[in-house]
Amino acid sequence: NLRYGAVAVNHWAQQPMVTQDVDFVVAAEAVDRTVSLLEEAGFHSERFEWSVNFKGCSAVSLQLSTEDFYRDFPSRAVAADVHGILLRVASLEDTLKGKIKAWSEPERRQSKRLKDLADIARLVESHPHLWNMLTDNLKQQVQPPEKT
């Protein structure tokens, strides 16, 4: 399993933020098995066109992406200690690409797009070389990184 959303951003950014969901990806052939395992563990699942969302007993939900965009993320994932738990998270560049994709979706709620923009800014602040990956539109909305 690979974490690619806010959990990955919190790993790569210097200042972590709270998240209410864990976004993850598995190999395409493992989706049905993953859904079964989580349902057996007590999670309720709901399938959508691009994801399977899970809700358990806590306020934190899980979102399994089934979108082709994320298919190669696991091959570039890195091991990371996230709050004392060893996880595989999306590479730094893939984390940014995922956030840019989410921010670019016009049907997303404004509050989510603003959070995506903040996540993009946090990543660029922590890793200035990522500035070159931003679109011109994003460069107008995110401050350039400080030169050191």
Tell me what each language-model feature is:
Residues 1-148:
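Compositionally biased terminal segments of proteins
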